């Protein structure tokens, strides 16, 4: 029997974005936001969304919350290259429904933080920002018009 995992997505795994086909989970409600500010950047030649694990810096990041099973979480982990120290790491983060009251109970869920090593020496195209939009994704050099 597979376990249900809740994961906050803020980049290419969001509905409408280029890696959404990997995200075969069930969306939970509308938008969600990090309970604490975190810096989100668009970096490098691929213009990747890069959320750093620096609570208290940046802005509250807006994204989507999904419930996924073990197989989908494993597919997401492969996409995000958890075995490579220059890519992402999966950690817990507190999120709340957005918009919503600041004192609403926060939920602890999974998120992919970009590694500090992967951030170093990259060109920063935008950030800190509160949301990775479709218009930001549209300028990805591998995206076809």
Give residue ranges: language-model regions.
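Glycine-aromatic micro-motifs
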Residues: 2-145
């Amino acid at each position: 029997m597979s376990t249900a995992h809740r994961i906050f997505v803020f980049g290419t795994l969001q509905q409408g974005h280029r890696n959404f086909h990997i995200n075969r989970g069930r969306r939970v409600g509308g938008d969600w936001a990090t309970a604490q500010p975190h810096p989100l950047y668009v970096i490098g030649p691929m213009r990747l969304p890069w959320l750093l694990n620096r609570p208290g810096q940046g802005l509250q990041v807006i994204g989507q919350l999904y419930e996924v099973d073990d197989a989908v979480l494993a597919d997401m982990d492969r996409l995000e290259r958890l075995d490579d120290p220059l890519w992402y790491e999966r950690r817990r983060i507190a999120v709340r429904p957005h918009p919503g009251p600041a004192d609403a109970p926060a939920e602890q869920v999974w998120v992919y933080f970009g590694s500090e090593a992967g951030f170093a020496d990259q060109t920063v195209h935008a950030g800190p920002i509160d949301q990775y939009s479709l218009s930001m994704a549209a300028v990805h050099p591998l995206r076809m018009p």
